[in-house]
Amino acid sequence: MEMASAFTLNVRLDNIAIITIDVPGEKMNTLKAEFASQVRAIIKQLRENKELRGVVFVSAKPDNFIAGADINMIGNCKTAQEAEVLARQGQQLMAEIHALPIPVIAAIHGACLGGGLELALACHGRVCTDDPKTVLGLPEVQLGLLPGSGGTQRLPRLIGVSTALEMILTGKQLRAKQAVKLGLVDDVVPHSILLEAAVELAKQDRPSSRPLPVRERILAGPLGRALLFKMVGKKTEHKTQGNYPATERILEVVETGLAQGTSSGYDAEARAFGELAMTPQSQALRNIFFASTEVKKDPGSDAPPAPLNSVGILGGGLMGGGIAYVTACKAGLPVRIKDINPQGINHALKYSWDQLEGKVRRRHLKASERDKQLALISGTTDYCGFAHRDLIIEAVFENLELKQQMVAEVEQNCATHTIFASNTSSLPIGDIAAHAARPEQVIGLHFFSPVEKMPLVEIIPHASTSAQTIATTVKLAKKQGKTPIVVRDKAGFYVNRILAPYINEAIRMLTEGERIEHIDTALVKFGFPVGPIQLLDEVGIDTGTKIMPVLEAAYGERFSAPANVVSSILNDDRKGRKNGRGFYLYGQKGRKSKKQVDPAIYPLIGAQGQGRLSAPQVAERCVMLMLNEAVCCLDEQVIRSVRDGDIGAVFGIGFPPFLGGPFRYIDSLGAGEVVAIMQRLATQYGSRFTPCNRFVEMSERGESFWKTTATDLQ
């Protein structure tokens, strides 16, 4: 049976051809290699019909134009040459669209990304909707690739080289108003008239490319170009620390096209695409993409979730305010906040106001939409309005008795079906539910700060939590825009448990004489977004170290931190960024204020600050402990799979994405190599580096954590 076509042609009475994109059986339109013959058949018909005045590409999907190319095509390539051929085929198809003698217009609604934007760039004009769902971008760099169907050549010529480089190097997505301002699209219209607006544009002569701003014209010239690429290259190297080869190749390919012409540019683009597709960095980043997609589809349990119509939140502090924001503004659910005083409620409301007002100022949101979203949030100092809430999220202080009291109050004041979800970061959920009348409806829901930015949540059922409670909580997390992993109710759960030994080792090296900036720089060079010492400052030293005694009590000496260091710092009223002094000093709020290491730290903790370790040695000590703890968590079934372990580390603490997560990284090194490194470190520095039994057994058997499956790139 022949598969239905993803591209269909209809010719209107006014001789405008409408090409409708609708990939059968898929929510999102993605481009596949087999579609090329369909498009070419349509192009042939267009060329044969001499009556046609213009062509419009439009999507039949409700919320996307084309979300990109099907990434599985790249995974199916075994060599750089095969991937290069894939790119050249894409370039050729786009060239054939562009070569049509009549105006070709893209009518864009929803996501227009990657190969979708490259198709739109091959058209002679573009019209998009003013809908918030409409975004345009080239995110290939986030998969360790570059745009391979002409995007590196067409975009700089359309909007200017400096603006194009920013888009391609960062994967930045533009909203409609930004796109029209930059000249990426010709017009922005309401969704209701998108097709007619595109048709009207198609009836005119080909839209002439508008002149670039003077600055962009200067930067495209030989002198300006040399200066621009030198500056951007330096900035990019600092940002990526040389860990992402795609950025270097993007600069090279764009510059080639500008200096030597589009023919050379397209050739360089295809070759670079093929080579990048075979890099371990791209394979790791694509694996993370596939894993996160799978996690987002995972319901958490086999039971059907309960209905979710409204949510309550206990506590209007930083976490409570953030949770209220994502619940109302991302999930679209009514939220009722309870706090013991009105100031707490005001704080939570202001949190959402600040987030939404920022969007209004950046013109990402209309004022009317801001007001509509804010209207979903209300507050109270008692349980008024809580009687019929489907799920309550508790975000009060880390105190077991207080949280147990919250459970009792919710059971007394809410419906019998209400779920109680605790945002605890360290207390066992089983203990919180110990005196509950309905323990099957108590669960952990651990958000990370800042709530609106951190993509991960940990969902923690205790022994008596029902399958439906798990499924309902997972459902809420997804509606909030989060990536949820279900973890076992053991001290530290997963993310904090693998993070603690990593930070402890950094503090221990500090006491041994390593300098703060050397430790942090070493881990940033390794690939983390910030170093462990700075991370502790950002989280809050008082908050970040609170969990350490809990973990040491649960797991023993390998979690012991240099107690004198922590106590000395806290006794000196150093809490980190939040009070302006921690390991670093922070200037007054403002654009020019920069953090700097406080030299007073060294005498305070009795350290010399004259280190002997190289950056790789520093990174090795911190990272090996994290890897070992991740394997311990898998062995103890704290995480359900290596997939969840990799996603939890990358999304929860910024484990370098280009390494694919702890388990992918172990597989790339080989379990035997990692065990040998840890045994050497154990001899040098102590028993905390002793590899866990599962690690040793896998090493002896030559096994890897990730097994080859249909969806797994090896």
From Swiss-Prot:
The chain's disulfide connectivity reads: none
Q: Which Pfam families match?
A: 3HCDH, 3HCDH_N, ECH_1
Instruction: Read off the PROSITE patterns from this record.
Output: 3HCDH
Marked site: Important for catalytic activity: 118, 140
Extract the GO molecular function terms from the UniProt entry: 3-hydroxybutyryl-CoA epimerase activity; enoyl-CoA hydratase activity; long-chain-3-hydroxyacyl-CoA dehydrogenase activity; NAD+ binding
Q: Which domain of life is it from?
A: Bacteria
| Assembly, per entry | Heterotetramer of two alpha chains (FadJ) and two beta chains (FadI).
Q: Which family does it belong to?
A: In the N-terminal section; belongs to the enoyl-CoA hydratase/isomerase family. In the central section; belongs to the 3-hydroxyacyl-CoA dehydrogenase family.
Q: Which SUPFAM superfamilies match?
A: 6-phosphogluconate dehydrogenase C-terminal domain-like, ClpP/crotonase, NAD(P)-binding Rossmann-fold domains
Keywords for this entry? Answer: Cytoplasm, Fatty acid metabolism, Isomerase, Lipid degradation, Lipid metabolism, Lyase, Multifunctional enzyme, NAD, Oxidoreductase
One Gene Ontology term, aspect cellular component: cytoplasm
Report whether Isomerase shows up as a keyword of the record. yes
- Descriptive protein name: Fatty acid oxidation complex subunit alpha
Q: Which CDD domains match?
A: crotonase-like
Chief localisation class: cytoplasm
